[in-house]
């Protein structure tokens, strides 16, 4: 069963469900993101997708690349680009940690979940991850199935 958030104001906007399947996530980090007004209004309607996006450190800044935020219908004249690079807010110490992590072979920055925090600000949880091979994916799937089967047996017998 999914864990309930500690704060009732915590609202998930978009979730990258493939991230945990395709990548072995070593650690995660909460970052802010710079958005335009029409993007925030579109996110409040839940119209976004981060499944195909990734993060990159470029020229001393952290960027979210290839994320989709649907256009806000009421802001047609002053709307926003649907897929554009969006700057993320992170401290210098965390930025250097992320840059060092991505310099290791096979490591990448993957967005895990986008949400509104208790103050109503859009936050993004990104993970430092390493891509899984097909065999690793099968092992993860087998472990998950075995844990479900164990839970079923314990529920029936206990």
Curated annotation (Swiss-Prot):
This protein's record includes keyword Repeat: no
InterPro entries in the cross-refs: SmpB (IPR023620), SsrA-bd_prot (IPR000037)
Primary role: Required for rescue of stalled ribosomes mediated by trans-translation. Binds to transfer-messenger RNA (tmRNA), required for stable association of tmRNA with ribosomes. tmRNA and SmpB together mimic tRNA shape, replacing the anticodon stem-loop with SmpB. tmRNA is encoded by the ssrA gene; the 2 termini fold to resemble tRNA(Ala) and it encodes a 'tag peptide', a short internal open reading frame. During trans-translation Ala-aminoacylated tmRNA acts like a tRNA, entering the A-site of stalled ribosomes, displacing the stalled mRNA.
Listed name of the protein: SsrA-binding protein
Signal peptide limits: none
Organism annotation: Jannaschia sp. (strain CCS1)
Keyword Nucleotidyltransferase (UniProt): no
Family named by the database record: Belongs to the SmpB family.
Basic residues biased stretches: 149-158
Localization (cell): Cytoplasm
Gene Ontology cellular-component annotations: cytosol
Alphabetized GO MF terms: RNA binding
Alphabetical list of Pfam families matching this protein: SmpB
Start-end of Basic and acidic residues biased regions: 133-148
Keywords, ordered alphabetically: Cytoplasm, RNA-binding
Entry superkingdom: Bacteria
Principal place of residence: cytoplasm
Annotated segments matching region Disordered: 133-158
UniProt-listed CDD domains: SmpB (cd09294)
């Amino acid at each position: 069963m999914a864990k309930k958030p500690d704060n009732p104001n915590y609202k998930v906007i978009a979730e990258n469900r493939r991230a945990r399947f395709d990548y072995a996530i070593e650690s995660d980090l909460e970052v802010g993101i710079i958005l335009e007004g029409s993007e925030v209004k579109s996110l409040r309607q839940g119209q976004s997708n981060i499944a195909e996006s990734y993060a990159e450190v470029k020229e001393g800044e952290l960027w979210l690349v290839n994320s989709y935020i649907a256009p806000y219908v009421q802001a047609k004249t002053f709307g926003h680009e649907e897929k554009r690079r969006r700057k993320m807010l992170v401290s210098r110490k965390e930025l250097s940690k992320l840059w060092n992590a991505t310099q290791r072979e096979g490591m990448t920055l993957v967005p895990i979940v986008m949400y509104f925090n208790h103050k109503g600000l859009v936050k993004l949880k990104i993970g430092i991850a390493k891509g899984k091979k097909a065999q690793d994916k099968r092992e993860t799937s087998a472990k998950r199935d075995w844990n479900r089967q164990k839970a079923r047996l314990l529920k029936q017998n206990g």
